[in-house]
């Protein structure tokens, strides 16, 4: 799949029109699904990436928060893009933010207990009245699609009191508790931002279910990318996903974002949701990140250690970069450009995991923003489309059959794919994070000629009578040897 956006997409692009025109081109390249950004109105209007959720029923149809369209276009353009993707044989996964709401029109006075933002286990004051923007009336929509309005009692907590305007403080509403079965950072990580939905409320669960069915009926989407799942009670999702799949009448693909570099916690979460969704392989991303910044001193033989790709491949969505890890973003941990061809070879040419290509890695981009140090930076991310297209071709033509691994060297690793009945030609992948490398590997094809699909090495390689050969790669590079 491709994540078809990054944080700094220009609103003038009209992303929905852009993807509509490129649907067949993407299919021809080898993409079978796109993860599209949040399609509903955010409190930031035209400039909202989609995660400051305001009205999930407004797909760019109503004049709310200063705009009819979203950052990516109008409802009609969104639906036309989905239709074009489906016509090209590409599935669509909708980015879905269920955790919070932001940008309410009306204030309400309610009793709440203050907590330090960084310690959700111990109150820092007495329960008192606060004034919060917790009434969501959606005046621009005027009850179309849903007449549900959000009030303070639908939320657990907020982070703003209009009476005191005290910073770094959360306010837990009286009679509420922070949701259980969530991440344990800060004592309890149920609260992330805005008005935090109370998933212990039946009214909230019913409304989220109604919206999910409406969204599927409206868009015909083939699955969900679920945002910020570590902030939502894990017990909520199995039943919700069952209802969504039953309503859609198809086996919707679902991947959740649980951002934590801890394989044991990801195993716990997958078990907690009864294996009903995949999750992003965050530990693999961090392995790529550290390898790319180690100057050739990373143990490449351990690149898959502690990852879902290695330990739970059927539930792993593998990725190199995303909109949160890209430079200047909240979870900034960018993989260095020189290493990205190696990382993409790992996720695209092995049999484990469901790989996700990042828009900015494919097309490249430039943008400016402020860093965490307060300084403004200009960022240039180069396009890796040429090499990714080569890898996608190799995946489609050669990544079949038995896989033999040669993760037996500190710098140079490789693996081979022997092909199957329908795809009889073999492939050998070799990479090094340091000096040029070579490796004796079996491809099961005696006396066969192999050439480097990446064109990094021009001379062909021939296997011996037992189907083995010494395959080579340049330093800090990857070569993909395919049978002629």
Q: Predicted segment positions?
A:
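Boundary/entry segment of secreted carbohydrate-active catalytic domains
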Residues: 1-14, 191-197
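Active-site-proximal helices and loops of the catalytic beta/alpha 8
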Residues: 2, 18, 23-31, 37-40, ...
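Short, histidine-centered active-site or binding-site loop motifs used for metal coordination
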Residues: 6-8, 60-63, 324
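Solvent-exposed, acidic/flexible segments
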Residues: 12, 16, 71-78, 201, ...
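Aromatic/His-enriched, Gly/Pro-containing loop or helix-boundary segments
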Residues: 55-84
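Long, low-complexity, polar/charged, intrinsically disordered or flexibly structured peripheral segments
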Residues: 146-203, 217
